[in-house]
C-alpha cells in the first residue's frame, strides 16, 4: 500500500528497528528518523550506530537525527533545538515511538498533527517503564503483550489505542519474548497507521487506575543469584536475564553465567543453598532454599555459552563445591 500519511519515527534498539521496518515495508513515507547517538560497543569499543540508525542509513531515510537530548533547556540546548527544528521542517502527521530512550518534551509531543504513538511491550498499566519484558518474566507473569498508546508527558501513562496479549511460555526468555513482541508491535502499529490514514483519527481509552506497576531498568548486579530463594524464582531470573545481563554466581572466585536451567523439586534436606549436588552431562545441579536448580547451559569469563557436558570438560565442578550467594 502507499499512503500520504507522513510518519516520523523515534527509536533505538532492535525492538524499534523491527517496527520501523514494518512501517517502511507497509508503504508509509518515513519523513524523519530519530535515534540515540552512536555509542562505543564491542571489545574494541568502536562507535556503533543503533539498529534504527543502521536501518535508516541503509534505506536512505533523511533526515536522521541523533541528538543527545531533546530538551531546549537541558545540557545540550543547541543539539536539541537543531533536531526539533529539523523535525518541524518535515511536517510529520504522526510520530511512532518505540524504545527511543530519550524523554520527549511537550513541544515534541505536540509537533505532529496526530501526536505521538508509543509501542510499549507490556499490558499497561502493568510494567510501565524501561524493562517491561524482563520484569514480566522475572515476576512469573502468565502473559505479556503490546500496548499502543497515545503519548502524554507522563511515564507510559497515555491513553490506550490497542492492546494484544501473548502467553509467556515456561521456557521463554527475555530474548524469545522480545522477538515475539517486536514482531507483534510492528504489525499492530501498521494497522493503527492504516486506520489513522483512512479515518483521520484513532480511538483511545484511558488506562485503568488499578494494577499499575513499574519496570525499573535492569542493573547488572541484579543478575547475581541468591541461593536461599526458591528454585522456581531463580529459574525466572535465569530466563529474565537472558540475553542481558546473564544470571550469574561465583564458584571459587570464578563468575559463571547461567543461560538455561530447569527446576528439580527434590533435594537432600541437609544440603545448604548454593551447594553443588551433581555435575554431569545432564547439568550442574545446585541446592536452593527450596528445590534445586539444574543448569544446562553455562559460560565462564571469556568463553562461549556451552551445554553442561562441554562446559565441564573445560572447568571441572565437583559435588560439594559451593556457589557464592548474592547479598
From Swiss-Prot:
Keywords: Protein biosynthesis, Transferase
Cross-referenced InterPro entries: Fmt (IPR005794), Formyl_trans_C (IPR005793), Formyl_trans_C_sf (IPR037022), Formyl_transf_N (IPR002376), Formyl_transf_N_sf (IPR036477), Formyl_transferase-like_C_sf (IPR011034), GART_AS (IPR001555), Met-tRNA-FMT_C (IPR044135)
Highest taxon, organism lineage: Bacteria
Role according to the record: Attaches a formyl group to the free amino group of methionyl-tRNA(fMet). The formyl group appears to play a dual role in the initiator identity of N-formylmethionyl-tRNA by promoting its recognition by IF2 and preventing the misappropriation of this tRNA by the elongation apparatus.
HAMAP family listed in its UniProt record: Formyl_trans (MF_00182)
Similarity comment: Belongs to the Fmt family.
Class in the EC hierarchy, top level: transferase
List of residues binding (6S)-5,6,7,8-tetrahydrofolate: 122-125
Residue intervals passing through the bilayer: none
EC numbers, comma separated: 2.1.2.9
Gene Ontology MF, one: methionyl-tRNA formyltransferase activity
Catalytic activity annotation: L-methionyl-tRNA(fMet) + (6R)-10-formyltetrahydrofolate = N-formyl-L-methionyl-tRNA(fMet) + (6S)-5,6,7,8-tetrahydrofolate + H(+)
Species whose genome carries this gene: Ralstonia pickettii (strain 12J)
Keyword Protein biosynthesis among record annotations: yes
Annotated protein name in UniProt: Methionyl-tRNA formyltransferase
GO cellular component labels: cytosol
Amino acid at each position: 500500500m502507499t499512503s500520504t500519511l507522513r510518519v516520523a519515527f523515534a527509536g533505538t534498539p532492535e525492538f524499534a528497528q523491527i517496527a520501523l521496518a514494518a512501517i517502511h515495508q507497509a508503504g508509509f513515507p518515513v519523513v524523519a528518523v530519530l535515534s540515540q547517538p552512536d555509542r562505543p560497543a564491542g571489545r574494541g569499543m568502536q562507535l556503533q550506530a543503533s539498529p534504527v540508525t543502521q536501518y535508516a542509513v541503509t534505506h536512505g531515510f533523511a533526515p536522521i537525527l541523533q541528538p543527545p537530548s531533546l530538551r531546549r533547556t537541558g545540557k545540550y540546548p543547541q543539539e536539541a533545538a537543531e533536531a526539533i527544528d529539523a523535525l518541524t521542517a518535515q511536517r510529520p502527521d504522526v510520530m511512532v515511538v518505540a524504545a527511543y530512550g530519550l524523554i520527549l518534551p511537550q513541544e515534541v509531543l505536540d509537533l505532529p498533527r496526530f501526536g505521538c504513538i508509543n509501542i510499549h511491550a507490556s499490558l499497561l498499566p502493568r510494567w510501565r517503564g524501561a524493562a517491561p519484558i524482563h520484569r514480566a518474566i522475572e515476576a512469573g507473569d502468565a502473559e505479556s503483550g503490546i500496548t499502543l498508546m497515545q503519548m502524554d508527558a507522563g511515564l507510559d501513562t497515555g491513553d490506550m489505542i490497542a492492546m494484544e496479549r501473548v502467553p509467556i511460555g515456561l521456557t521463554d526468555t527475555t530474548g524469545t519474548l522480545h522477538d515475539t513482541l517486536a514482531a507483534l508491535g510492528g504489525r499492530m502499529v501498521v494497522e493503527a497507521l492504516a486506520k489513522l490514514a483512512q479515518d483521520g483519527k484513532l480511538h483511545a481509552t484511558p488506562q485503568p487506575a488499578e494494577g499499575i506497576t513499574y519496570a525499573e531498568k535492569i542493573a547488572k548486579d541484579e543478575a547475581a543469584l541468591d541461593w536461599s530463594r526458591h528454585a522456581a524464582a531463580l529459574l525466572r531470573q535465569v530466563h529474565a536475564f537472558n540475553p542481558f545481563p546473564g544470571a550469574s554466581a561465583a564458584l571459587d572466585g570464578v563468575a559463571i553465567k547461567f543461560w538455561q536451567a530447569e527446576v528439580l523439586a527434590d533435594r537432600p534436606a541437609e544440603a545448604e543453598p548454593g551447594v553443588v549436588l551433581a555435575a554431569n552431562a545432564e547439568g550442574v545441579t545446585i541446592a536452593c532454599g527450596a528445590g534445586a536448580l539444574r543448569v544446562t547451559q553455562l559460560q565462564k569469563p571469556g568463553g562461549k555459552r556451552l551445554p553442561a557436558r562441554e562446559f565441564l570438560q573445560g572447568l571441572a565442578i565437583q559435588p560439594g563445591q559451593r556457589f557464592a550467594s548474592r547479598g
